[in-house]
Amino acid sequence: MASSSTETQLQRIIRDLQDAATELSHEFKEGGEPITDDSTSLHKFSYKLEYLLQFDQKEKASLLGSKKDYWDYFCACLAKVKGANDGIRFVRSISELRTSLGKGRAFIRYSLVHQRLADTLQQCFMNTKVTSDWYYARSPFLKPKLSSDIVGQLYELTEVQFDLAPRGYDLDAAWPTFARRTLATSTSAYMWKPPSRSSSMSSLVSNYLQTQEMASSLDLNCSLNNEALESFDEMRLELDQLEVREKQLQERVQQLDRENQALRMLVSRQGGQLQVEKEMGYLAVEDSIGLVSLVAELQKQGDVSQATVKKLQSCLQALELNVDKKEYSPSALQLENMAKELDTVRGSLGRENQLLASLSERLARAEKGEKTPPDTELHQEPVPADLVLKFQELKGKLQALEGENTEAQELNRQQSIKLEQLAKELQLKEEARASLAHLVKDVVPLQEELSGKKQESAQLRRQLQESLAHLSSVEEELAEARQQEKQHREEKQLLEQEATSLTWQLQLLETQLGQVSQLVSDLEEQKKQLMQERDHLSQRVGTLEQLAEVHGPPQSAEMPEKRQQCLREEQVNNSTVSEAEQEELQKELQNMVDRNQLLEGKLQALQTDYKALQQREAAIQGSLASLEAEQASIRHLGNQMEASLLAVKKAKETMKAQVAEKEAALQSKESECQRLQEEADQCRLQAEAQAQELRALENQCQQQIQLIEVLSAEKGQQGLSLPQVNTDQLALSQAQLEIHQGEAQRLQNEVVDLQAKLQVALGDRDKLQSQLGVAETVLREHKTLVQQLKEQNEALNRAHVQELLQCSEREGILQEESIYKAQKQEQELRALQAELSQVRCSSEGAHLEHAELQDQLHRANTDTAELGIQVCALTAEKDRMEEALASLAQELQDSKEAALQERKGLELQVMQLQQEKEKLQEKVKAAEEAASSFSGLQAQLAQAEQLAQSLQETAHQEQDALKFQLSAEIMDHQNRLKTANEECGHLRAQLEEQGQQLQMTKEAVQELEITKAAMEEKLNCTSSHLAECQATLLRKDEESTMLQTSLERTQKELEKATSKIQEYYNKLCQEVTNRERNDQKMLADLDDLNRTKKYLEERLIELLRDKDALWQKSDALEFQQKLSAEEKCLGDMEVNHCHDCKREFSWIVRRHHCRICGRIFCYYCCNNYVVTKPSGKKERCCRACFQKFGEGSGSNDSSGSGTSQGEPSPMVSPAEASPQSIGSQGINSVCRPPDDAVFDIITDEELCQIQESGSSLPETPTETDSMDPNTAEQDTTSNSLTPEDTEDVPMGQDAEICLLKSGELMIKLPLTVEEVASFGEGSRELFVRSSTYSLITITVAEPGLTISWVFSSDPKSISFSVVFQETEDTPLDQCKVLIPTTRCNSHKENIRGQLKVRIPGIYLLIFDNTFSRFISKKVLYHLTVDRPVIYDGSDFP
């Protein structure tokens, strides 16, 4: 019944969970907004899921006794899964969570936010081994149907978005029941983002591949993995190079776009300048056209005057006709007078006509640009000076206008040339842009190749994973009891050593606390001393007051009563003020002394801590150097031994070759000796045969000689008796004798030849015998040498074997010692490697930033140079225009002066004409009188008729000229009269204005006279008053001398007192500032020390947990080894067949045992040997163990040869191999993020690697909640994202806003423009604690200002950004980021920058140190404000 009730309850809970999931999906679809903590369905879902996760769970506890929950189950299942462990890393990074239950709840919320809860639970349920280890049989997770139903229902939540706050709730107590306001809906996933360890996708892939490849390559030394590693390294390098090239191309494109925009702006500016210059040229041309039109108008006026002259001539002719018709009544005298007057008039008219003609001719010549011929100039009369000046002025104006026109044309031509050049530059830029487009097109196939490489890398990765899986399966079968016991013993010793080091650090901290208490006591003693000094100063102040009171009474006796009262009041006020000020100063002094004491104590404590840290760092560096030296010496010894072994082998081979050569030479010599002996025997036989023949011939010769003698004797006896009978016989005998003699001679010759041959053969024999003796001696020497070489070889082999044994023993000892030392110093080595990688990354970033700054500076310099050229051109044009304006003004002034001169000349001419008019009127009156007296003069007329007739002809001739001259003069006078009248009008207006001004000046003079009179009266009064004052002054001079002496004395004393007070005040201010700074630094350092202490405590707990887990592993391994030993070690009689070849054992086929696994095999399968111990001894094993050890050690020798010297033993445990792989990974990791941390922590990926490399151990869960501080100190604007988080990243602008909203503010300094303007030349200090940021706000009320800054930081770099806020009430979401957060190398160089104010508001300068968890920064900054220079045209006249 109980079981059925629990099953029904479980089914009801599962149905409720499914209903809650469907309600959440419906709520999201209907509302369209993310689910928050306010949702009741979410509360229901959380409780139901937690109930299922805790249902029928096995009770487990950690080493410290804390209960384990489903969080530890998640860690055990997902610690090795790439991507799924991001949530585990994030939850471990939250320091607020203390219990396993709270961490599990945070992990479920993380999975909901990232929409991967169903995938995570499915991965956990698929690991049936771990699930059965954590849950009993009644759990629904062990039932496939129920677990599949739960996961299938949870997959509906993958499409639902959740907006849950990552922090701010007490998840250890309960689930959240209300929604806390987050930064933004888009930043929720960003806040849930786990700490990243890489800066780009390629580095992320490379780091992951390195973690997989390093373990396999260092543990197993497999050639396949080495090839895969090389290919992966090459692909990673190609990927990095392609990324760098793509970035360079993008930067180049952007730079070319900026240059193109700048050139377009330049072209537009120069086009505007050209337009202005063209307008100027058009104005000059219009002026010249106006002058030409003026000349044309003058010509028209001349034509009009000629027409009027013609009209006057016609009128005169009509008058002459009328005069002819009249009777000749006047007398001859009157006619003569009239003739004289007409002559004078004709002469004047002729002169004027000549002047007009010359002027017209000169004007025509000036227009045509020709000169007057010399013959006409000779006949002309002198022209008046005013007309010459006027003509020269007109000519000069024309020339100036022509010069300006030519200058304008030249400027136009230059501008057109500039435009052509700019057009060419634009064309070049367009061509460059086209080339860039081609380059971009070329990048496309490279990207395709890159994608292909990525696919190949994925295939290689799969192959690598398969090989790793195979290797892990092989490693599980490589366990040996003694070796693993030894490994666990070593690990135990390492853990004990780490525990002792941690206890030693705790003792150091306790000693530091004791030093701090000692410093506090010292500070109290200093406080007492300062109190004594304060008492002494108060006594001195009392003495000064007494002195002031002593000097006071004699002065008061001499002063009048009123002055004495005033002085008493002032003394009372001063005394009260001075007492109050002294009390305040004493209080401030006391406070400052206390604070100074505290700060000095803290400073000394920090200095001692710093010295201790420096000593520790020096000791670590020394130990590291010693370890490196030992490793180098070991490597050197190994190399020497290998070299000596190779040399011995080579010498042995060379000796063998020499022995073979000597043996071949000996054999050849022996064959030669045998051949020579055979030849000598043959020669000996031939000599013996020839000697026998010679003897036989000698016998025959002697016989024949005897016969001859006998015959000769017989012949002599018979010669007497028978001379004739024996003559024939005698001839025959003589012939025979000759024949025999010839044969004997021949035989003698042959004997001589044979003797010579015999001698030669005997010589050859002697030679051969000597050579044979030499060869035998050489052979004996060679045999002895060979024997010696064999003995030496055997001795060398024995010595080499002994050396190898000694080296192997030494190597084993050194390896053990190096392992111990390396494991001791491993953590410090990692820290140093991390710092090295950080310094390298920071140096690379600094180089990149320096290059970018140089490019920006170069572009700014080019822009400023171009602007300077434009400004110079504009100033030159301005100067030219000013000169032109000045010349025009001068010409206008000259024309005005010339007009005045002309006006004067015209006035004179008008006066002359009036006089001539009066004379003509008198003459007309005289003519009328003469006409009245005409009757009396008829006689004279008759006499004068002849003269008149004679003169009439001349008069007719001269009349025409006079008429023309008169008409021209009349028109000229009329024009001059008109101009004179106009100028007179202008002069009248000017005279009226001057009269008004004179009237105003007269009124002002009258007012001044009135004021003068009043001033004279006042002066009289003041003079009388001065006389009285002088009298009083004389009386008071004596008093003032007395007072002055007393004042001087008191002033000196006061100056001394004020100088001392000022000195004390300055010292106090300095001490206040120093103590504030020291307070801030000490608080930050204390905070840092507390954090490190807390971290070390957590690390100690983690190490204890790891130690417990390792003990559990060792116990499980021992148990498994015992079981395997019991299973494998079978009796000899129980096994009847060989395990390898299945051959039946008999009395011929014997049984053999494997020295590793205990299997039994036959004689035919026993030819397998493997090295399993550091001593290098080979042991017989079965075929399966030989294959396992052969693959593990990378040996290809089937005959059982051992591993080479210098390689690690194949039976090294995974726990020993993992630190090496981790260290190498730390060395090879290039893209470690820049960091200020001085600690290095084992990350989760490294723990996963250790677990993968040590997969032969039983899979028991371990708690490794350590977190890498490198990941927590990354920049907020970093683009390093895992592939799962790229879609949850907000815009780059939100990082600064998020910092302002949720970051911890250290200091906020509000400033105004006036305060920045009065900043001074020095720098100010700003303190930024670790994990905080400081803020400088500058309020700007007017646009156009330029704010500049220079800052540096100490001891490390800092991040900087600028944000704009319209008003203080403006929400932070509406702020604008002007300069995004950038990491500046301000600890190496000064960082400069400026900002042009476009909109009035508040500009926030942010110094961000949130990326640094342990190190506080000091920022020295300097601010300036530049106002814009506005040109008001004051340079023009």
Swiss-Prot record:
Positions of post-translational N-acetylalanine modification: A2
GO process annotations (BP): plus-end-directed vesicle transport along microtubule; positive regulation of autophagosome maturation
Limits of the RUN domain: 36-169
UniProt xrefs under PROSITE patterns: GOLD (PS50866), RUN (PS50826), ZF_FYVE (PS50178)
Any one of the GO CC terms: late endosome
Assembly with partners or alone: Can form homodimers. Interacts (via C-terminus) with MAP1LC3B. Interacts with RAB7A; the interaction with RAB7A induces FYCO1 recruitment to late endosomal/lysosomal compartments.
Annotated PANTHER family: FYVE AND COILED-COIL DOMAIN-CONTAINING PROTEIN 1 (PTHR46753:SF2)
Protein name: FYVE and coiled-coil domain-containing protein 1
Species name: Mus musculus
Gene name linked to the record: Fyco1
